């Protein structure tokens, strides 16, 4: 499992982000969701996260910039993700599905992201 902490930009705002291959989905907190397009979910979604169960009725389209590269992905809005190992609040939890979609690979030993597989264009077959 790989985890990297890094700032990404959302609508010009710097957001403390945890890239975590152990999390399937992507989550944002309400202060980030305020600058995103949000919609109500058709039903309440429950997620086991950070030792507890979180519920949401809101989804968002996350448009962000990671190391100068644009990404767009689906995210769930939850009140609080939690704090990192240093006690800093996590604003975005970037999950494995979005990392796979955008060719992002955490390199924990070097505390960086590998974006060599970032797609400049999508080729569908």
What are these regions (language model features)?
Residues 4-46, 75, 93-95:
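Aspartyl protease active-site motif detector
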Residues 1-19, 64-73, 110-111, 116:
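Active-site or ligand-binding cleft "flap/edge" segments
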Residues 9, 48, 65, 74-78, ...:
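Residues in well-ordered beta-strands of folded domains
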Residues 8, 38, 53-55, 64-66, ...:
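Sterically constrained small-residue positions within well-ordered secondary structures
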Residues 71-125:
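Glycine-rich flap/beta-hairpin and adjacent strands of clan AA aspartyl proteases
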Residues 1-13, 42-59, 80-93:
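Pepsin-like aspartyl protease folds
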């Amino acid at each position: 499992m790989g985890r990297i902490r890094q700032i990404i930009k959302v609508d010009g705002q710097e957001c403390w982000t945890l890239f975590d291959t152990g999390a399937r989905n992507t989550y944002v907190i309400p202060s980030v969701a305020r600058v995103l397009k949000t919609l109500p979910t058709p039903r309440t979604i429950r997620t086991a996260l950070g030792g507890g169960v979180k519920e949401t009725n809101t989804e968002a389209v996350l448009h962000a910039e990671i190391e100068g590269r644009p990404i767009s992905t689906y995210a769930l809005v939850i009140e609080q993700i939690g704090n990192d190992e240093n006690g800093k609040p996590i604003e975005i939890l970037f999950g494995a599905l979005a990392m796979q979609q955008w060719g992002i690979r955490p390199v924990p030993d070097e505390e960086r992201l590998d974006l060599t597989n970032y797609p400049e264009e999508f080729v569908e077959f």
